Amino acid sequence: LSDHALPEETGPYILVSSTTEAMKKIAAFYRTQLSCKVVGITGSVGKTSTKEMIASVLEQRYKVLKTEGNFNNEIGLPLTIFKIRAKHEVAVLEMGISDFGEMHRLAAMARPDIGVITNIGLCHLENLGTRDGILQAKTEMFDHLQVDGTVILNGDDDKLSTKKEVNGKPVIFYGVGADSAFDIKKDIYATDIENHGLEGMCAKIHTPPVSYTHLRAHETGAYLV
């Protein structure tokens, strides 16, 4: 791709008015040709850690492609999508934004089957104004969720807990502890968190009706649960 004419010795190329826009359109088309499931992850903080943990769990059973580093913007996301091959069963894609409309453009490429939002914090207030503005911008992801898609939200976040339904389907909420300060029921929650410093942490992960599963993670900081 090039937005200007190149010398003949350069070889074949496609002349476009904007290489960035062309790349996004090609990525969106390529996504329609893929059969793998896509997990889209966003949030004010914790995107990359959450992406790494989700990919690590899924890799125990599936062929997974994940966003490398934080290639999560309008250039990094299409480059990641182009790496998906027929062998991949799941793609875990991180999406980062700083203004309105960006998530709309990212999600139009990713078309996630599962959408995960970690939290609504105070990042990029210079463009988004308030936490309600951040909520609005992040949840643009839902406009491009697959028809049978699933939304997973942090039930301990006061803003995200207001989103009880998306496209007429109930949201899956997760959090720490069974009780909620908001009017929701947590579907997945952690209890008995033990922080062992550099040796990692332990917790019980409850997924009713199953009682719980023991979790041991080699991560420092109980907040990562």
Per-segment meaning from a language model:
Residues 1-25:
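N-terminal leader/targeting and accessory segments in enzymes
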Residues 2, 7-11, 116-216, 222:
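Acidic, Mg2+-coordinating active-site environments of NTP-dependent enzymes
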Residues 13-15, 32-38, 92-99, 183-191, ...:
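Short, mixed-charge, low-aromatic patches
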Residues 14, 65, 172:
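General small-molecule cofactor/ligand-binding pocket signal
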Residues 18, 69, 176:
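Active-site donor-binding loop signature of nucleotide-sugar glycosyltransferases
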Residues 21-155, 159-169:
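Phosphate-binding loop of NTP-binding sites
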